[in-house]
């Protein structure tokens, strides 16, 4: 489902509230105040808070699917695919730091098993894609084949998550794209075969 411009505005405002005040502060009153509409006007776009959070996760999933499709459509090597996926995440979160806070917030997912399941589905798609790039690179002799693709995925994406969290907690005190890119290159040097 394609979101209207107004729904995108509402989603961005909801993301900002969750990121800066917490999930409990995401109320129709606070959301309506933030975007300058009545509470009743919000219900034309979303039935309730659950639907709104589900749409936030759907929004993130669409963004993620877009980059995965871009990689599939491009002529990227497996190593370039890994780099493109990870660097795209750093660019996205640099542009939308509140989205990073929400997506990496365990508070959001412990409140509702539906949210947890939806986010696990998104993570599984990421895991499948990145592990596939790793496996292809191993088959091409570009990444050491004595390393587990699952463990490499956790190293690559786990370090990304830690870096984004560190960046958020420091109030964006460093260049996330540069630090992320430098970190990824360090990891790649460790896992790539010596040519």
Regions found by a protein language model. Name each.
Residues 6-9, 17-51, 55:
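Helix-turn-helix
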Residues 13-17, 92, 159:
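Short amphipathic alpha-helical elements of helix-turn-helix/winged-helix folds
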